[in-house]
C-alpha cells in the first residue's frame, strides 16, 4: 500500500476527519455499508484504545415539516435493520446534548449505535492486523507518478523511489482519484467540494470538558441539524 504522505497521519482527510458515523441513509446499500463500518470499528482497538465511540446520533427538527420527515427516516431505518432507532422528545434530546434549547425543537431522531470513529487509530489497527499476518506492506512518502500499462493491461505503478509491479491496482485516493485516472487515461467523474468547519469557544454547558483529555470530547451524542446543513461533535 503506497501513500503520498507520512504514515499514518497522511495529511489527507484521515488525519482531521470529524469521524462522525450516521448510519441512516435512503440507499439500502449505503445504510448497510455504514452498519458494517460501525460493527468493524467497534471490534478494533489500538494500544488498548477504542476505534469507535458509540455515543449515539441525533437529528433535531425545528419545524413541523422536518419532524414529519424524521418519521420517514425512522421507517427507512427500521426496514434496513436499524431497529433501535426512535423518535425522542425535546427533553430527551437535552439529556444527551446539554447545549440544546428544548423550547426551539419539536424533537429528535435518535440512533443509539451511531457514533464517532477515531480514523487514524482505526487505520493503525487495521495496518497492524495486516502486517502481523505478513499479508501486506505499507510504504509512506511515496506518491504514484504514473502507471505501467501494456496492451491495455496494468503492469505496475511508477514512483519517485522506483517502480512496483502489479497486475491489479486499487485506487483509493479520494479527491485525488481524478488525477490518478488521468495518469491511466481514464476519466473518473469525481469532483471534490469544499465545506466550512468552525471551531467554537467553550460552552458553559460543557464546562466540565477537559481539553487535555481527548476522550472527553466524545461523551455527548453527535448532533445533526439538516435545516441548516450542520452537524456537531
Give residue ranges: language-model regions.
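General beta-strand structural signal in soluble alpha/beta enzymes
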Residues: 86-89, 138-140, 171
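Dinucleotide-binding Rossmann-like beta1-alpha1 core, especially the glycine-rich loop
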Residues: 18-96, 229-232
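Active-site substrate-recognition segment that forms the wall
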Residues: 19-22, 32, 39, 43, ...
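Glycine-rich FAD pyrophosphate-binding loop
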Residues: 1-14
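Short, flexible, mixed-charge acidic loops at enzyme active sites
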Residues: 11-18, 99-101
Amino acid at each position: 500500500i503506497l501513500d503520498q504522505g507520512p504514515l499514518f497521519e497522511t495529511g489527507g482527510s484521515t488525519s482531521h476527519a470529524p469521524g462522525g458515523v450516521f448510519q441512516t441513509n435512503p440507499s439500502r446499500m449505503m445504510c448497510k455499508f455504514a452498519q458494517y463500518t460501525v460493527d468493524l470499528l467497534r471490534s478494533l482497538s489500538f494500544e488498548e484504545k477504542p476505534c469507535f465511540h458509540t455515543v449515539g446520533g441525533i437529528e433535531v427538527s425545528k419545524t413541523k415539516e422536518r419532524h414529519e420527515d424524521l418519521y420517514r427516516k425512522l421507517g427507512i431505518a427500521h426496514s434496513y435493520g436499524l431497529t433501535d432507532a426512535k423518535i425522542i422528545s425535546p427533553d430527551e434530546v437535552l439529556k444527551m446534548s446539554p447545549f440544546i434549547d428544548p423550547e426551539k425543537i419539536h424533537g429528535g431522531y435518535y440512533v443509539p449505535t451511531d457514533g464517532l470513529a477515531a480514523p487514524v487509530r482505526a487505520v493503525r489497527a487495521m495496518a497492524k492486523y495486516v502486517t502481523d499476518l505478513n499479508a501486506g506492506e505499507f510504504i509512506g512518502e511515496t506518491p504514484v507518478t504514473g502507471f505501467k500499462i501494456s496492451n491495455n493491461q496494468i503492469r505496475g505503478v511508477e514512483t519517485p523511489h522506483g517502480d512496483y509491479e502489479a497486475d491489479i491496482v486499487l485506487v483509493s485516493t479520494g479527491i485525488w482519484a481524478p488525477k490518478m485516472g488521468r495518469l491511466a487515461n481514464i476519466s473518473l467523474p469525481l469532483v471534490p467540494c469544499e465545506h466550512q468547519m468552525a471551531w467554537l469557544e467553550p460552552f458553559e454547558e460543557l464546562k466540565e470538558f477537559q481539553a487535555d483529555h481527548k476522550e472527553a470530547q466524545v461523551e455527548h451524542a453527535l448532533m445533526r441539524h439538516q435545516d441548516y446543513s450542520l452537524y456537531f461533535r
